[in-house]
Structure formats: C-alpha cells, structure tokens
UniProtKB/Swiss-Prot annotation:
Alpha-galactosidase involved in the degradation of simple oligosaccharides like melibiose, raffinose and stachyose, and of polymeric galacto(gluco)mannans. Keywords: Glycoprotein, Glycosidase, Hydrolase, Secreted, Signal. It catalyses: Hydrolysis of terminal, non-reducing alpha-D-galactose residues in alpha-D-galactosides, including galactose oligosaccharides, galactomannans and galactolipids. Gene3D superfamilies: Aldolase class I (3.20.20.70), Golgi alpha-mannosidase II (2.60.40.1180). One of its GO terms (molecular function) is alpha-galactosidase activity. It comes from Hypocrea jecorina (Trichoderma reesei). Optimum pH is 3.5-4.5. InterPro entries: Aldolase_TIM, Glyco_hydro_27, Glyco_hydro_b, Glycoside_hydrolase_SF, Melibiase_C. This is Alpha-galactosidase 3. Glycans are attached at residues 37, 56, 197, 259, 293, 393, 469. It comes from the Eukaryota. Belongs to the glycosyl hydrolase 27 family. The active site is at 347 (nucleophile), 412 (proton donor). One of its GO terms (cellular component) is extracellular region.
Length: 624
C-alpha cells in the first residue's frame, strides 16, 4: 500500500459523517509536479504530525525537528471535545495531495467552523535525484481548487454584441436528448429547506430543518399540486432536493438508497403517480465512500477498485476509464426507475459550480454521460437536470446541450440567513445570467436542445414569505416564463395566495409557458435593438410561424450589485420600444398585456411607465 493510500482509507469514513467543505490555498515556491519527488523522511514526519494533531486539539505546532517541515493547527477549542479539530485529517490530506505533492511548498486550509491548518516544506523535502527510492512521487493536483470568490470568468463569456438595428434571428427549441418538448413544472423542497428556520413560517415543516425533512412534509406540499388548477397547468413534478438519501448506508451493491427513517421512495412514488404526479430526486457525482467494499451489481468488481479520490461532498469520485463504473450507474438508475423516479437533478458539476469551497474534479461531465446512458438503458422516461452555473463557453454549451433536459444558469436564488425565499438583488443576478446564456445560445445558430434552469420559482407566496413585493413577483414570473425555464415552485404550497395562483395556473400563464417552450425570449434593447444589459430593457420571443410573439418590457430598478447594467435610475421610468428595435417592423401588431388584458394596435413604437422592478408581458399578434 502506498503512503498516500494509507491515509485515504480512514479519511473516507471520516468524511461520511458530514460533508466537509474546506478551502485549500496553495502558496510558497512553485515547482512542476513530476520533476521533483517528496522525501519519505518528510512524508513520514508529516504523517506523524497529523497523528499528533488529531490526538491533541490543543497542540498548535509540530515539525520534523530538522528545520525542513513545519505544521500548525488552530482548533476550535470552544467546541465540544469531539468537534474541536475534527477536520484535521481531511484538511491535511488536502494540504498534502493538492499542494505539497502537487506543485507548491506551503498550504493553508480553512473552514467556517473556526478550524485552520497550515504546513510548509523546505527545499530539503524535495529531490530531483532519479536514483532515490525513499521518496513519494509528486503529481498534478487531482482536483480543481477554486477560490471561494472565483467567478470562473473563462466559463461565462459575454455574448457577442449585436449591432444596433440588426435583424432578428428567432431562437427556437427542439426536443431534448430524452425527447422532452418543454421544461419541467412542479415544486421542489429546497426553497423551504434553505430558510433559516422554516418551521416558523411553513406549518407543514414544523420540527424539521435543512436536510432533515420528511415524506409527510413532501406529501402535504405535493398534495396541492394534485389539485385541478395545478394539474391543468402542467405542474406535475414533486422534486426532492438533498436530504432524502441515507448518509450512513448503501445497499449490498453500493447503490444510493433513501433514508428509511424519514422516507419510503417506492411508496411516495406510488402515492404521487396515483395523483398523476411525478417524482424527482437530487444527487451529486460519485458514490458514497462507505460503499468501497461493495461489489457492483452484475460484476465481480469492488467499488474501491474503480475510485479516483474523495471530493469532500460525502461521495468518492469514480475513475471513468475503468470497467464497472458504467455498470454501477446503470444499476443505480435501474433501481430508481423501479421505485418510480421520473427526474434526476445532478448537482455540483464541473466545469462550473464556482465558489463551492470543495475539492471537485476539474471535469465531471463523464458523470453526466454515465447517468444519461443509464437513463436510456433503464427504459423509463426520466428528465435529467444538471447544476449549477455550468460553464457555458463555446466548448461546453454544446456538450451540456447534448446531455440533459435543463442546465442551471446561475447560483442559488435562495435568500440564505433569512425566513424569506428570495431578494430582488439575487433576482437581478439570475436574469443577467440568463441574458448571457441566451445570447451565447443564439450565437450557435442551431435549435436549442436544453432548457435553462434559473432555480426555483418564488412567486406563489405573499411578500412576507416570498421576500419581494407583488410587482416584482409579476416580474419574476414574466422572466421565468419568457426564458422557457424550469417552472419549479419553491416555497409553501399551502400558502399560495390569489396572485400566486394567477401567475402559475391562469390560462394566460399556461399559454405563455407553452409558447416560450418553443421560442425563448432574447434581449432587444429599447432604442437600439442590441443585446446588452440595460436597466430599461425589452425582450422578444418569436415570432412564430403563425405570426405570434411575446414581448417583455421591464424597469429593473437601480442595479443592486449583480444586474450587469450598473445604472441607478430611481422611481417610474418611461420605457419605449419600437417595432424596429424588436426586429419586427413592416407590419402592424396588436399588443396585449397578458395580466391586465389591455390591448393596443402598434405600428411604430410602444411605451409604458414602469416603476422599479415593474414589467409588462405582452402578447403580440400581427394584424396584416
């Protein structure tokens, strides 16, 4: 057994107890991995110090006694004895594998529970003597170490600027990889899970928090989806976010199973299907680390023989070059299909998932491919949603478009640390990310085969829970409709008010959703028709072959930090967009506000006075 493997085995068990989301920072002198080796003397001293630190949270310093290796820990001595330095092992594994053995000579590791670790290796710990055998080989870092604040700019380029007055290229959507012709509609647990104390504001969540929610809560919420008004509007997906899985057990073949204390997924799926609803579940790449000794179904292969490290998110990563990996995915999806699962959300994918604070594989697209193949083999029609804020440059947008039904275009919309669902500042950011996404899709000049996932739709609850006023609730709904995005409600289905019902289940909402599923909207700036981010903005979806279109005009209000437009116009503003701006001049059109029902005939331009955060969604029909 190699020195590195000797530490990885107990680490797997440690990580299973809770997800460790530390941040490693490499520094010091740089070297090219493979050109130097790490001396076994320094390696053993490193391991000895780790053991000392683990045994004594009060110990601060440790070194090799020769001036070549120095290490420190700052434990959280105010915590309970078992939690003061419980990150020490995983922290020093990261310091060792991601930095000292991978191109850097110093490293720090920090985590939000007030634990901090550091190590530095001097030149004497490294050798370029090829004849020495008392060494540990250096290697490229097995993970992409992302700074918590990294925006991964190479992943999210701005779309090419469209020329003022340029022709309109209608964007169309074709069938997805698995044959779906619209984005998903339904409800998801996470909006309530993310509330700082959801049990205070969502009665059916009483006694629950975060990842610890129950099947009874899900049935209470999704029972509302079974009502005729939601069923008619197509809101049929009941989606479980993280928390349904067992974290301390797998089945005999190492497959992910449900937490039997709080769930019975086959029973839940049956309950939903009897009501014409569908079941969705949340997953992340990899396999639970405690499954390492299990044998993959239909093979003689142990899971531990096809792994490629630990990604700090409870799971261990697969080496997709090895036989057995696809068979594991096939067996997992086959079991979920037998339970009645209709949708998979695959989260923490890369390239993407920026600022995650974890050690993720640089490219986990093979996990998407493996699940896609497994879905096809299962014979069940299952949606695949991939997440989050995935790389959308010219390399990756075509790849994701060929693998899944929908892709997350931004980070979470949730208003963390509060008991409200969202804040308008984050809403502006989500809309700006969609603007970039659709502009990049338009440049490809091909029908879209994937839908945007803009995160949960927080429009059905009144302001005290939604976190935004009714004016902005309209605007959020208008944008999610216009994008052809997943319409997955977040929040409390038992507190849907009259406006929430109108926004999601009215005929005008259904008609708009069906239209935008085929013709997603794109920006056409008032006055120029360009696609830049503007506070006073216009969008158009279509026109269709039947000479129908939708136009959205909006005043986003002052840029709250992530709107992309930087201006700060306050109060009501006049928004005027011409048919030329929209790219549909030469004909007369009837503009009808879908929510108020007011209509006007337009031959030149259309104007409206809109306050901060206000918008109008207009249905257009050509009159000649």
């Amino acid at each position: 057994m190699s020195p590195s493997a000797a530490v990885l085995i107990p680490l797997a068990a440690a990580v299973l107890l809770r997800p460790v989301v530390g941040q490693t920072q490499c520094g010091g002198n740089l070297y090219t991995p493979g050109t130097l080796n790490f001396t076994l003397e320094c390696y053993n001293a490193f391991q000895d110090c780790v053991a000392q630190f683990e045994a004594n949270a009060s110990q601060v310093d440790c070194n090799d006694g020769k001036g070549n290796l120095f290490m420190q820990q700052q434990a959280n001595l105010g915590a309970s004895p078992g939690s003061q330095n419980n990150d020490a092992i995983i922290a020093f594994q990261d310091i060792r594998d991601l930095c000292l053995l991978s191109g850097s000579t110093t490293a720090t590791w920090g985590y939000s529970d007030n634990q901090w670790y550091w190590a530095a290796a001097e030149d004497a710990c490294y050798t370029n003597d090829p004849t020495r055998t008392d060494v540990v080989k250096t290697h490229p870092a097995p993970f992409c170490i992302q700074n918590r604040d990294s925006s991964l700019p190479e992943c999210y380029p701005q779309p090419d600027a469209t020329p003022p007055g340029g022709p309109l290229k209608v964007i169309k959507t074709a069938k997805t990889r698995n044959g779906f012709k619209s984005s998903a509609r339904g409800w998801n647990t996470y909006g309530v899970q993310a509330l700082v104390n959801g049990s205070q504001v969502v009665p059916s969540f009483a006694g629950q928090s975060g990842l610890f929610y129950t099947q009874k809560f899900v049935e209470t919420q999704c029972g509302v989806l079974a009502r005729p008004e939601f069923k008619k509007a197509g809101y049929d997906l009941c989606s479980l976010d993280s928390g349904w899985q067992a974290t301390t057990a797998v089945d005999q073949h190492g497959r992910i199973i449900y937490n039997t204390t709080r769930f019975n997924l086959p029973e839940l799926a049956s309950w939903l299907h009897k009501r014409d609803l569908k079941l969705g579940v949340y997953i992340t790449p990899g396999v639970p680390c405690l499954a390492h000794n299990q044998t993959i179904l239909g093979t003689n292969i142990k899971i531990k023989d096809v792994l490629n490290g630990n990604n700090d998110q409870i799971n261990c990563d697969f080496d997709f070059r090895k036989d057995g990996v696809q068979q594991w995915h096939d067996s997992v999806v086959a079991q979920w299909a037998s339970w009645g699962v209709d949708m998979l959300k695959l989260d923490f994918l890369t390239p993407g998932s920026p600022s995650n604070g974890a050690n993720l594989a640089c490219d986990s697209s093979d996990a998407v491919r493996a699940y896609q193949k497994a879905i096809k083999k299962s014979g069940r029609k299952i949606r695949l949603d991939i997440s989050w804020k995935l790389c959308r440059n010219e390399t990756w947008l075509p790849i994701w478009s060929d693998l899944a039904e929908s892709m997350r275009t931004d980070q979470d919309l949730d208003n963390y640390g509060t008991n409200t669902l969202m804040a308008w500042q984050v809403g502006q950011r989500a809309i700006e990310n969609y603007r970039q996404y659709i502009g990049l899709q338009a440049q490809r000049n091909v029908p879209l085969t994937i839908y945007p996932d803009m995160d949960a739709l927080f429009t059905v609850n009144p302001e005290h829970l939604a976190g935004v006023n009714d004016t902005i609730r309209y605007t959020v709904q208008n944008h999610w409709l216009g994008a052809g995005a997943n319409l997955i409600i977040g929040g409390d289905m038992e507190q849907v008010d009259a406006l929430g019902l109108k926004l999601t289940t009215s005929k005008q909402s259904i008609d708009a959703a069906d239209f935008f599923a085929k013709y997603p909207m794109q920006p056409r700036n008032p006055g120029t028709g360009s696609n830049a981010a503007k506070q006073l903005q216009a969008w158009i979806g279509g026109p269709s072959d039947d000479h129908e279109a939708y136009v959205l005009i909006v005043n986003y209000g002052p840029d709250l930090g992530n709107g992309g437009f930087s201006t700060k116009l306050y109060g009501k503003q006049k928004v005027t967009v011409s048919l030329k701006d929209l790219g549909i001049s030469g004909s007369a059109w009837t503009f009808t506000d879908i929510w108020s029902g007011k209509s006007s005939r337009v031959t030149g331009s259309y104007s409206a006075w809109l306050t901060e955060g206000e918008s109008q969604l207009l249905r257009l029909k050509r009159t000649h």
